[in-house]
Amino acid sequence: MKDLSRKAIALTLAGAMAVLAGGQTMTVLADSQEKTVIEYWHCNAETQGGLTVDELVENFNATNDHIEVVAKYNPDMYKGLMQNLQAEAATGNYPALVQIGWAFLDYFSNNFAYVTPQDAIDVYDTKDASFLQDKFLPNILELAVNSEGEQVGIPYSLSTPVLYINRDILREAGLSEEGPTTWEEVSEFAGVIKEKTGKYGFYMQEPADFWAQQGLVESNGAHMLSTAEDGTVQAAFASEEGIEAMQLVADMIADGSALHVSWEEGFQSFVDGNCAMMYTTIARRAATQESAQFDVATVKSPTWGDKERVIPAGGCFLAITAQEEEQIAAAWEFEKYLYSVESMAAWTIGTGYVPPRNDVAEAENGLKDFLAENEMMNAAIEQMDGVVSWASFPGDAGLQAEQMLLDMRDQIFGGQVTAEEGMKSTQNAINELLAAQ
């Protein structure tokens, strides 16, 4: 599968280079013998698109005679990138283009200087003034609109959490190779797997964000946030349904049928064949296919009984943080390249992210053939009707509130507190933080 993916990416990037070589209808940068150098900040580790980031940047640089892009990886996901951006901004330095996680939409727009995509288009790409409206569906663009109604950036990486299953282990344990469909069944499967095979039954991703856990609790009817009649936003996850959801995973960890380890360790345990089920982003699809030496598949995110599936949109949008004219122009030219059909296809093939642009899936030079052959993408695509926004705390509380959620998760999964104790105390602390703004 590894060679097939790399070949597919190479073919799609060849198309993207042809587009660039043919020239695009955008205002050229000021005449200069030297290239304009810009930084592109991302948080894609090698196992989650980092190699494809490098390939996209290398191909752009090879075909562009006036811009050089330098990609900079930021560990600890979008929270880590925001912390690094905060440190750079304090010194007056900004990268040109950055990935911003959905959970930090309001925090970013409240605390950092940026150029809206339409403003960049209106100045540097006037011949393609309706690019956003032509290439993206309104509900997709809405994901990158802040609470003030401004289009802060353009959706880039779209993901949903799916359940990866090792069908070989399921068969060995005498379970259905189609996997569980509800969270109650996930718990039952995990227990049987541990008893029959001695292997771990389940792992839920634990990176530096609460994204997967939001899907867990909101699918049970809980809400991360609530809005009062006066518009006040409060944390609301410590409801009976939210507590039940988190306690289910904590109980699996306590009885030894589930893992409580870092994201990389959990991923490695799954692809090594030591854990039967892994709940994580579809963006790990490519890395999983390349590493797993067993019958691997994905199934849709489990529901709670007959309740509707509710899952947060994962991934990020791209925002222009360049401050000078040449940097802004270069950032937009590179960003538009990233949104070409060919580049979008390469991004999906190399990761698993669902393309946000509306004409990529069916395009001959896009994903038409790939999606027809790659069934592991189906689970993510088929559950897009259950997607909601990743909870974004209002005002300046985003980073601190997210860290509180991570500390709460570690305490609950680690057995230091019950779900009820941890969630109620953390909810109160976050609401005190929000009220103090």
Q: Model-derived features: where do they sit?
A:
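Extracytoplasmic "Venus flytrap"/periplasmic binding protein-like
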Residues: 59, 63-136, 172-174, 276-277, ...
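Glycine-centered hinge/linker elements that transmit conformational signals in sensory
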Residues: 189-192, 230-260
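Extracytoplasmic/periplasmic substrate-binding proteins
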Residues: 43, 57, 212-215, 244-333
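Mature extracytoplasmic/periplasmic domains
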Residues: 34, 44, 59, 113-115, ...
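Short, solvent-exposed loop/beta-turn-alpha elements that line the ligand-binding surface or hinge
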Residues: 118-136, 179, 222-244, 290-291, ...
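Hinge/lid segment of periplasmic solute-binding proteins
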Residues: 102-160, 214-216, 297-299, 368-371, ...
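C-terminal capping/gating helix-and-loop segments adjacent to ligand/active sites or protein-protein/ligand interfaces
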Residues: 312, 375-430
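Extracytoplasmic/periplasmic solute-binding protein
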Residues: 143-156, 161, 184-234, 275
